[in-house]
């Protein structure tokens, strides 16, 4: 189910979104038992099982038990391989698939590793995390980020994966039952949620060919359907000032990211052919 849906629903939605994406698979493609091998083949993966397909697909091969994925991610040997293909300003999305709980790593330890440990600079800050954690675990029903952690497990799971649930709730991720016999809807929901989250954030360039960027003159322009009459979203000081359409910087003095206000985000994500442009204003050379 996981292999089929990574190559099917997930890959199709991500590719159709026209996002500048990268997928990193942390799993073993070389198990002696074929049923346990995780091979992601074309169009997303490479023609040879377990190989990279730059610039969009990378596989870090390691046997993962049902309980140790967080600990192994934090292991220097494997994290360095993962980090080599991460981009500092890009939004990250984790998808955990297991019927067990994390041992010994807690959600708080994993989050601290990402924000202030070896992952610092790649996953955001405690004030604004640059990642979301989706969980396909032992919960008995699909759960939204706003719903509390459940202790009721689905039929074939060892437990409900409480640590993974904590990470999903913390970051606004989805939780789905690993016991489902068909993951199509699960990966469809997760892929769409990733596209929507990324669509509402734009990375700022370090410089402009036209000169020094004047951040007070930057405009965010939305074109309905990709060809309609453009609308310019106004700049607001911060998220709290979002009362209608608009956008704000993560750091007004030296922005690295532009985030759309909720109203504008909804407008853009509801438009399958939306075009959003960052128009730079310059001080001159």
Give the residues covered by each predicted segment:
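Divalent cation-coordinating acidic motifs and surrounding scaffolds
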Residues: 1-252, 283-285
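Surface-exposed interaction regions enriched in Ser/Thr/Asp/Glu
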Residues: 250-285
């Amino acid at each position: 189910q996981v292999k089929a849906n990574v190559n099917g629903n997930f890959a199709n939605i991500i590719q159709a979104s026209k996002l500048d994406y990268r997928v990193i698979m942390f799993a073993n493609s070389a198990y002696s038992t074929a049923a346990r091998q995780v091979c992601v083949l074309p169009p997303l993966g490479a023609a040879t099982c377990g190989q990279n397909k730059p610039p969009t697909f990378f596989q870090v091969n390691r046997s993962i038990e049902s309980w140790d994925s967080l600990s192994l991610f934090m292991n220097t040997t494997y994290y360095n391989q993962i980090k080599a293909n991460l981009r500092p300003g890009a939004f990250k999305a984790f998808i955990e698939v297991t019927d067990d709980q994390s041992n010994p790593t807690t959600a708080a330890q994993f989050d601290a590793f990402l924000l202030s440990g070896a992952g610092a600079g790649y996953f955001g800050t405690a004030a604004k995390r640059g990642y979301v954690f989706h969980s396909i675990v032992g919960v008995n029903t699909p759960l939204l980020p706003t719903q509390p952690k459940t202790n009721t497990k689905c039929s074939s799971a060892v437990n409900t994966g409480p640590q993974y649930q904590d990470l999903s709730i913390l970051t606004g991720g989805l939780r789905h039952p690993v016991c489902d016999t068909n993951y199509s809807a699960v990966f469809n929901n997760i892929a769409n949620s990733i596209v929507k989250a990324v669509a509402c954030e734009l990375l700022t360039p370090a410089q402009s060919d036209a000169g020094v960027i004047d951040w007070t003159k930057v405009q965010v322009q939305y074109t309905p359907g990709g060809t309609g009459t453009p609308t310019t979203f106004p700049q607001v000081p911060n998220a709290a000032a979002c009362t209608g359409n608009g956008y704000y910087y993560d750091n007004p003095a030296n922005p690295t990211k532009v985030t759309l206000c909720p109203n504008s985000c909804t407008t853009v994500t509801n438009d399958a052919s939306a075009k959003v442009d960052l128009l730079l204003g310059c001080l001159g050379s």
